[in-house]
Every structure is written in structure tokens, then in C-alpha cells.
Amino acid sequence: MQRRHQKVIEESPAPGMTSALRQAMGQAAIDVARAVGYVGAGTVEFIAASAAGLKPNGFWFVEMNTRLQVEHPVTEAVTGLDLVAWQFRIAAGETLPLRQEKVALAGHAVEARIYAEDPEHGFLPSSGRIVALKFPAAEELRVDCGVEPSGTVTSHYDPLIAKIIARAPSRVEALDRLATALDATIVLGPRSNVRFLAELCRARGFREGNFDTGFIDRNLAALGAAPQALDRGAAAAGVARLLATDQARVAALARAASDERHSPWSAIDGFQLATSRQLEFPVLVNGEDVSARVCHNGQAMVVTIEDTGPAEDVIAVEDGRAIYLLRRGRQSVVRTKDFDAVDADPMLGDGVIVAPMHGKVLAVLVEVGAQVTRGQQLAVIEAMKMEHALRAPIDGTVGEITVTAGRQVGEGARLMVIEPPGGFS
């Protein structure tokens, strides 16, 4: 299964493959290698016409790669052979321990490629630091991963994060096992295609073997590869987590919302109020302006973002100024709307302006030495096709600027410093 000529699902044996076609393709692959005098591990690719059924004379040569390819684990899973070890044996001049006619296939294996990309926005590549990464461990399940938690996915290399390979007695069972594994996979930070892959494993046409290389493009909406409505339930959970883990932020937000310097909401005491009061303040959810309502009666905190729907399990991971959430395989990111206004409180910041997310600096609106006032716009960052203004947390003087317009910056990157009147204490 492929998208834009890039494979995303590989399996063995191929659905619809007959023994006659397998024999014909295998012999053609051997003939190609012999024709060029190649000795070593290699992968020969063919394309087959499926409209009238797969036939021994209905395939054509595409290319040969003189190496193992990404999908070799599905072959290993159904043959029980270690192709990498065999590759080393050939390179060392040894003979292979098994003849072709002795290779037997058992069961079915399916591999899914997890990419750092955004299916909801045209599969645009995604980059950034990996906030959380966890894969399930189960029988007949293999995970090959090339990154680590806290590692960074950059835009300079292939966005492949990992491969998950599931094996089972039948194709349907293998697809079910893979879909379940994808449901349990956690990738937070860069956007990923995990949820999309799970939907693909459950797609009726694919499960029935009724597909071709254009299947994904024809079924994008059904597979969840289209802009989705805001996940308000996850957003509410994120706001609750944001507030529960940062009482100082609660105090600053409450003070900003009420304009009451001595309001009991300003006390950093874990919402120890005797009576219920509702606070409304703006947040950013995936870059979208959202108004969250928070009510606390001294015992419990309730967060509402319009109709949040029924309660569901939400995985939440705090990373700096953001809460990354995963619900039903879909990632949401919750941040306070005015990052730097929050930092205006002495307890929350020292005038250092950092990038709230990965993006491109569109404009730097001040110069070193400029006098600025609290709330003044300092720079503009573009991320996910949206512009985000960075504002001064305090009155003061611009003492340092480390970026220029047009530069790509990572989340948390130091951009500039505002020195308060009298300097830092």
C-alpha cells in the first residue's frame, strides 16, 4: 500500500499472489541479478497489472536495489530467516545455509511505517523534539525504531520514525494485531500518521484485498486524512493538566482575567476557595484560539470547552510551556494563549523570550536597546500555517536578540531578552 509512490504498508505474502506468479517473479529476479553479475543481498521490484487478476505474464521490471529494503522484516517474519545475517554471510564469502526450494512461508505479516507527518494537512512533514515515545510489547509483534524519546526529528532526513510489524496465522488477524498495536502506540511532539495507519488497517476494501496503489488517495476522508474538528475533550483535559501542574500560572491567569490584584484567585494555594467561581481565559489548541471555562469549588476543578463530549482516556504529557495530549490516536497541543503575558509575573519568568513552538520567524519588530512596554508585540512566528505574536512580558529594554527574520527555530529556542528597569537582580 502506498501514498504518493511512498510505501506505508507492506505485507507478506502479497494478497492475490499465486504460486505460479511467485515462481515467475522469483526466477525473473534471479535472472536480473545474474545478468549484471551481482552477488549479495538485493531487492528486485516489479509492478503487476491486477485488473484481470494477477498472472505469471502480467508483471514488469521496475528497479533493483543492491541491498535489503525497509520491508525486509515481513519476509523474515513469515520465513523465520534472518536476512541481515545472511547478508553478512554473503559478504564474508560464505555459502547460504538453505536452498530456495527449502524456504517455507508460515502465516502472514504486515508492516506499518510510522512517519513524522500530518495526515490532516496534506501529509506535510513534521519536525521537532519527541516529547513522548512508547510502543506496545506483545507476542508476534516487532518494533524497529530509529529515534529515542527526547530526540529530534529534523527536516533534513527521511521522516521515518519507526516500523511496527505484526505476524499472525492469517492476514485479517495480522491486520487486527497491527491495528491494536497502533492504537497503543504513543508518539507526541511531531505530528505522526499513527492514527491514519490504524484506520487503514481497518478499511474494508484493504482488509478484503480489494485495493491498488491508488486506494489511499481515493479514500483520504474515510481514513481521517482531512482536517478534523477540534478535539474539545482532549483540549479540556489539557487545560486541566496545565492548571493542576502550575499553580503560579493559575494565579497569573486569574489575576489577568479579573484585573483584581488582591483577588483570592491570585493566591498560590491550590484553588483553596470556599465558594465556587468561574474563570474564563483563552488558550491555544493546535494554534486555534479557544476559550476555556474553569470552575473550582475548593475540592474539584471542572474545565469546559463548549461541548466536550463524554469522558474518555486522554494521555497527557507536559513539556515546558505546552501540554501534549493523545486521545484515540490523535494529538492535540494546549498552550496558554499569551505565553509571555503569563511570564510577566516575577515568579514565572525573567524576561527571556523563547519560541513557544517550532516554526519560522516571520518578523522581528524591535532592535537591541529599544524601550518596550508590557504586552508590546516583539516578533511573529509562523507555525502550522498560522502566525503567532510574541509579546513583552515586562516593561524594559531589549538587551539581546538572537534571531533574524526567516530563520527556523525549535520550540523553547531563546529568541531575545528584555531587561527590566534597573537590570536583573
Tell what function each PLM region has:
Residues 1-27, 68-83:
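ATP-dependent carboxylate/phosphate-activation module, predominantly the ATP-grasp catalytic core
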Residues 317-355:
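Catalytic P-loop NTP-binding/switch module of NTPases
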